Amino acid sequence: MLNLFITSPLDQFEIRVLMGFTSPLLDFSSLNFTTFSLYTIIVLFTVLGLNLLTTNNNKIIGSKWFVSQEAIYDTILNMVKGQIGGKLWGYYFPLVYTFFFFIFVSNLISMIPYSFALSAHLIFIVSLSSVIWLGATIIGLTKHGLVFFSLFVPGGTPLPLVPLLVLIELLSYFARAISLGLRLSSNVLSGHLLLIILGGLLFNLMSMSIITFVFGLIPGVGLLAIVVLEFAISVIQAYVWSILTSSYLKDVLYLH
């Protein structure tokens, strides 16, 4: 049975099997339905619902939900247009917008107590960032051919320094595959751990007696401020992911 109470700061990040598939002939252990699968489906349906069901119902002035959705859309649109520029930004806007909303929603859902932190799993997030990096590299090679490798030679570099700078640029370029996901995962993981630990300590303090409950109200305000900060970080991290994705695409499209 799935335990609904967190007994360890790391319980929120543990993948549990919710439904197993067994067969006397075949091994279906890799097809188990886990908390990771459940929350991935929840995030996907939430993203689809927010984008498909939020309409203005043919009104001149849309609802608050529609206005907020339109504001997010315009923000990402202007960011992609400013980052990629040229005539190609429109081809990649849907990709960046989808990634922004997926990470944004998964971060917000992970803020719900006793929920599962999808974006805190390093393997999953680094896999996403690696796919973006690999896709951008393929786009660059397809568009420019061997000229793509001029990206690793900064303009105006003295000839004796070319081997060293090429090595540095190569290491920096390959590190993008990991750094994009590592940045998001580490921020979400550290923030959630801080909230769980401080929240647990505060709960234990306030449940001891009436006096400690009253004294616990003061640090409770500080904890509430940290929660608000974590909500802000959830939005910022999704936006940073989108900016860096657009920047990587710009580099391979225009080789600078």
UniProtKB/Swiss-Prot annotation:
Keyword Membrane: yes
Stored Pfam families: ATP-synt_A
Origin: domain of life: Eukaryota
Functional summary from the UniProt entry: Mitochondrial membrane ATP synthase (F(1)F(0) ATP synthase or Complex V) produces ATP from ADP in the presence of a proton gradient across the membrane which is generated by electron transport complexes of the respiratory chain. F-type ATPases consist of two structural domains, F(1) - containing the extramembraneous catalytic core and F(0) - containing the membrane proton channel, linked together by a central stalk and a peripheral stalk. During catalysis, ATP synthesis in the catalytic domain of F(1) is coupled via a rotary mechanism of the central stalk subunits to proton translocation.
Proregion residues excised on maturation: 1-7
Organism: Kluyveromyces lactis (strain ATCC 8585 / CBS 2359 / DSM 70799 / NBRC 1267 / NRRL Y-1140 / WM37) (Yeast)
The protein's name in its UniProt record: ATP synthase subunit a
Family designation: Belongs to the ATPase A chain family.
GO cellular component terms attached to this protein's record: mitochondrial inner membrane; proton-transporting ATP synthase complex
Membrane topology: Multi-pass membrane protein
MF (Gene Ontology): proton-transporting ATP synthase activity, rotational mechanism
Name of the gene this protein is made from: ATP6
InterPro entries: ATP_synth_F0_asu, ATP_synth_F0_asu_AS, ATP_synth_F0_asu_bact/mt, F0_ATP_A_sf
Subunit text: F-type ATPases have 2 components, CF(1) - the catalytic core - and CF(0) - the membrane proton channel. CF(1) has five subunits: alpha(3), beta(3), gamma(1), delta(1), epsilon(1). CF(0) has three main subunits: a, b and c.
PANTHER family given in the database record: ATP SYNTHASE SUBUNIT A
Bilayer-crossing regions: 33-53, 92-112, 122-142, 148-168, 188-208, 209-229
Localization terms from the record: Mitochondrion inner membrane
CDD domains for this protein: ATP-synt_Fo_a_6
Record keywords, A-Z: ATP synthesis, CF(0), Hydrogen ion transport, Ion transport, Membrane, Mitochondrion, Mitochondrion inner membrane, Transmembrane, Transmembrane helix, Transport
